[in-house]
UniProtKB/Swiss-Prot annotation:
Protein name: Eukaryotic translation initiation factor 3 subunit I
Record key words, sorted: Cytoplasm, Initiation factor, Protein biosynthesis, Repeat, WD repeat
PANTHER family: EUKARYOTIC TRANSLATION INITIATION FACTOR 3 SUBUNIT I
WD repeats: 8-49, 51-89, 91-135, 149-188, 198-240, 296-335
Subunit and interaction comment: Component of the eukaryotic translation initiation factor 3 (eIF-3) complex.
Main function: Component of the eukaryotic translation initiation factor 3 (eIF-3) complex, which is involved in protein synthesis of a specialized repertoire of mRNAs and, together with other initiation factors, stimulates binding of mRNA and methionyl-tRNAi to the 40S ribosome. The eIF-3 complex specifically targets and initiates translation of a subset of mRNAs involved in cell proliferation.
GO terms for cellular component: eukaryotic 43S preinitiation complex; eukaryotic 48S preinitiation complex; eukaryotic translation initiation factor 3 complex, eIF3e; eukaryotic translation initiation factor 3 complex, eIF3m; nuclear periphery
Compartments where located: Cytoplasm
Superkingdom, taxonomy of origin: Eukaryota
Pfam families, per database record: EIF3I (PF24805)
């Protein structure tokens, strides 16, 4: 599984994201420009320049018409993908930690960090996607959810499959479900800080099932990832690692999840990647067991994204590199012992 290595950022990666078709890969880092790449060959299509500092998050709408970025410069920017033009900028009261389009692309959520005296919020903006009036967006959000009432600031967020709920991860290990129309808290769950004795339980990533977004995975500094059902809001699976996890993703087609993380650079005594545990880890989604690792980064993995058709994945690291992997035949053919037995029984060979 030889990757394409993309060198387009001067500093650590913060998020990578595929568009719905998977032909484009979007990336942001702790520098001030986002990049758009062809995922098939790693050629850079262009850059989105306009932020004045670190860009924490990026997302693209279902039509690959618009993309949004949020950064430490207190700005949320809306871009036209076709020409890389910034069509609108919303001001934020504090650094923007996460942006995410609703499944229909009509709304955009943004997390404003709980710093500088600002109460942490999740704001929802209505998106006008008419080409003729892209610059005429509503300046004020249609909904503001204050997350302070949960006793902890929001770190990550995303939408349920029907767009009815906003799922928010917090730095105290809790996950909350809010009604996306009223902003009311529906329920919350402690997803991290209960599986081991780790003190840092901050949730670092949330990604949804690619098929229908009916369940999602969270990663945490507590060295675990959890799979949670959107409707019942119960923990389905727990994946235990040996280092703080920064990111987690669910693969389509095959029943796997991918975790990424590693010890923070300042805590690693040698530069060996095995020492810092800087590999992408593959777990069986059902059986919760680790089945393999992929090396390559020379620092913690900060973000992973899986190709929508399940043919590969991309990872972005603290080392400033993006690695685009295409799965080989051994990945596609891999079966757990229980799966192999079940398949043989179905075929009548045992």
């Amino acid at each position: 599984m030889r990757p394409i290595k993309l060198m387009g950022h001067e500093r650590s990666l913060t998020q990578v994201k595929y568009n719905r078709e998977g032909d484009l890969l979007f990336s942001v880092a702790k520098d001030n420009a986002a990049s758009i790449w062809y995922s098939s060959n790693g050629e850079r299509l262009g850059t989105l320049e306009g932020h004045q500092g670190v860009i924490w998050s990026i997302d693209v709408d279902p039509e690959t018409h618009l993309c949004a970025t949020g950064g430490g410069d207190l700005a949320i920017k809306l871009w036209k993908v076709e020409n890389g033009q910034c069509v609108y900028t919303w001001d934020s009261p504090s650094p923007v930690r996460r942006v995410a389009f609703s499944p229909d692309g009509k709304k955009l959520l943004a997390i404003a960090d709980q710093v500088m005296g600002h109460i942490g919020t999740v704001s929802v903006f209505d998106i006008n996607d008419d080409d003729a009036t892209l610059s005429q967006q509503k300046a004020e959000p249609s909904l503001v959810i204050e997350t302070k009432s949960e006793g902890s600031k929001a770190t990550v967020a995303g939408w349920s499959g029907d767009g009815d709920y906003i799922i928010v991860g917090h730095d105290n290990g809790y996950v909350s479900k809010y009604d996306s129309k009223t902003g009311k808290l529906v329920t919350s769950l402690q997803a991290h800080g209960i599986h081991n004795e780790e003190k840092n339980v901050s949730i670092t990533d949330i990604q949804f099932a690619p098929e229908d977004r009916s369940y999602f995975i969270t990663s945490s500094k507590d060295k675990t990832a959890t799979l949670i059902d959107v409707d019942t809001f119960e923990i389905l699976k727990v994946y235990k690692a040996d280092a703080p996890m920064n990111t987690a993703a669910i693969t389509p087609v095959k029943d796997f999840v991918i975790l990424g993380g590693g010890q923070e650079a300042r805590n690693v005594t040698t530069t060996a990647e095995s020492q810092g545990k800087f590999e992408a880890r593959f777990y069986h989604k059902i059986f919760e067991e680790e089945i393999g690792r992929v090396k390559g980064h020379f620092g913690p993995l900060n973000t992973v994204a899986v190709h929508p058709d399940g043919t590969g994945y991309s990872s972005g690291g603290e080392d400033g590199f993006i690695r685009v992997h295409t799965f080989d035949k051994s990945y596609q053919d891999f079966l757990f012992d229980a799966e192999r037995t079940e398949r043989a029984a179905a075929a009548g060979t045992i």
